[in-house]
């Protein structure tokens, strides 16, 4: 099992120049290799097996940057092709834009070429860089690779990928009759409703900061493109987006941590978030809630502790089924926010669904 730690780094001016050169070389090599593959296939109907070494003679500037970063470019391109052949809907590999593509590169650990110490990290070609190491890393973890990235705001980060032994946290054998199971139902407002009494509301960070973001974007639209004021204002807009993103991630990490610590099993409905955002006209609410990201974080945190995330089938009638008597309503409108049953049960619609998801997960686990 792999785990990544992301720390902010503070390169000096000389290192910033080399980082910019590495980002550019990786983008250039990716585009060149992709272009040659396309031309070769058009001419011969065969796939070209090109490598970074084939380009260093024609483009000597590639020798100035980390060779492992260039090797990873080849791996990323091959992965893009594999993803396309596996599922054409993903799309054919695209060329990387100089201004719109993400500025990052990955390098690997070879013969101790990367070293991590308190408040600094040593990287190939860059030597020692100051780093804000805000948490300790277990000595038993094995460092595999480091990804260096630059945000639109101008901040630099190092993502350290460690390998963790799979046998450390084996899934525990619970008595599912008595296990602590939490059911979660997606909600348009507040992100989710829980089967237990957990009061944790999403702050809707994007909407709260929307006015400020709109103000900064209006200022940007009035700047002359390419001027110093334009780039200065563009950075302010990027900082607004970054703050919203960090607030959202902080909320999701803290909430998923609490769930993983408190419960043995967490059950969620296996809904298609992408389809919901496109088809139900709830795009902004769905994206602001980040429910899909929340499920992803919850799953790895539970697995980390030897616990389980159970996905209940999306066609299970969690909202239409009464959590008391089990009867299923044939007609239930989306506007009906309170569930009323003939047995006398009166309950919030989303809470009823969360309880049903919890009990369905328990049934699935007991059935094996």
List each model region and its residues.
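Long, hydrophobic, amphipathic alpha-helical segments used as structural scaffolds
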Residues: 34-41, 81, 85-92, 164
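Stable alpha-helical structural segments in soluble proteins, enriched in small hydrophobic residues
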Residues: 33, 69-87, 351-361, 365
